[in-house]
Amino acid sequence: MQFCSIGSGSQGNAFIVQDKDTSLLIDCGFGLAETEKRLDNQGIKAEKITAILLTHEHEDHIRGAFSLANKFKIPIYLTHGTYKMCSKKIKISFEIEYQFIDGQKPFQIKTIAVTP
């Protein structure tokens, strides 16, 4: 398993966790073009992202998530509360696949087990 910071700070946060079968983007706080550039700099193609996991609704964690998900048909994993708050901040696309999680219980995204 590999873990890579795509960027961290007040301008944006994004991390990638990968194994041989799954590429999980944790948060996506940079705009679409910047996210694609940062992923490419790490040798990661945006279209290969399996899922996006949003930890919370702050702008520096969600800025590019919905655009990236919409462009590459990537599912977004998030809590109902995060979804509700995001929908107040940005236009939510109903074409995106949303997977609602319980922020207090472990869950699986393909081959990666996530424990909150």
Predicted regions span which residues?
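Structured catalytic core of nucleotide-sugar glycosyltransferases
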Residues: 4-15, 56-58, 87, 114
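Active-site metal-binding motif and surrounding structural segment of the metallo-beta-lactamase
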Residues: 33-81
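Conserved beta-strand hairpin/beta-sheet module of binuclear metal-dependent hydrolase folds
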Residues: 1-42
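Metallo-beta-lactamase
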Residues: 80-116
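Generic preference for hydrophobic
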Residues: 3, 52, 76, 98, ...
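A generic structural signal for short beta-strands and their flanking turns/coil linkers
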Residues: 13, 22, 48-50, 72, ...
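A generic "binding-loop/recognition-motif" signal
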Residues: 11, 31, 58, 82, ...
